[in-house]
Regions:
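N-terminal beta1-alpha1 ligand-phosphate binding loop
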Residues: 1-28
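A generic structural motif
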Residues: 28-33, 115
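Glycine-rich phosphate/pyrophosphate-binding loop and the adjoining helix
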Residues: 41-42, 116-163
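A generic "alpha-helical surface" signal
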Residues: 12, 61, 101, 138, ...
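Short hydrophobic segments within beta-strands
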Residues: 6-8, 36, 89
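Helix-loop-strand module that forms the ligand-binding subsite of alpha/beta enzymes
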Residues: 38-122
């Protein structure tokens, strides 16, 4: 069982949040975590993973073009992504910087791929996914770990019911 954590990060802020998501995945026995920036991710990485957690900084209220180009470029494997788990995380420079719309743009792409999407757990806010503004990294680090763990636990549960 594998969870892919992929992201775009120009300054390192989103990468740092991706690493926290990875920490959460690693807490679940039997689930491997593959973490890659979106410019290094391959179609095989998508196909070989049971779940995809994607992250982006906010760019004009949406995901970065670099991450969107992955979804656009992988359109040919959409049918093979049906039923896989999807989740999202986002970062912004400012507190009211469009994080929720960015999360929704990522989740929307996952829905178009036929994926089953999930938000962050209730003990991490219970919204569309994990998001924070610059300077809030320490506050939301634990929420990213919780998201990664929640995704990995669902991978295990779904694997047990399909086997």
């Amino acid at each position: 069982m594998q969870v892919l954590v992929t992201y775009y990060s120009r300054t390192g802020t989103t990468r740092n949040l991706a690493e926290q998501v990875m920490r959460g995945v690693q807490q679940v026995r039997g689930v491997e975590c593959l973490i890659k920036p979106c410019d290094e991710v391959s179609k095989e990485d998508f196909l070989d993973s049971d779940a995809i957690v994607a992250g982006s900084p906010v760019y004009f209220g949406s995901m970065a073009a670099e991450l969107k180009s992955v979804f656009d470029g992988f359109n040919g494997i959409r049918r093979h992504m049906e039923g896989k788990i999807g989740a999202a995380f986002a970062t912004s420079h400012h507190g009211s910087g469009g994080k929720e719309t960015t999360l929704i743009s990522i989740l929307q792409a996952m829905l178009i791929f036929g994926m089953v999407v999930m938000g962050d757990p209730m003990n991490a806010g219970g919204h569309y996914g994990v998001a924070h503004a610059k300077g809030e990294e320490k506050e939301y680090r634990d929420d990213a770990v919780k998201l990664g763990k929640r995704v990995a636990e669902l991978v295990v549960r779904l694997s047990a019911t399909s086997g």
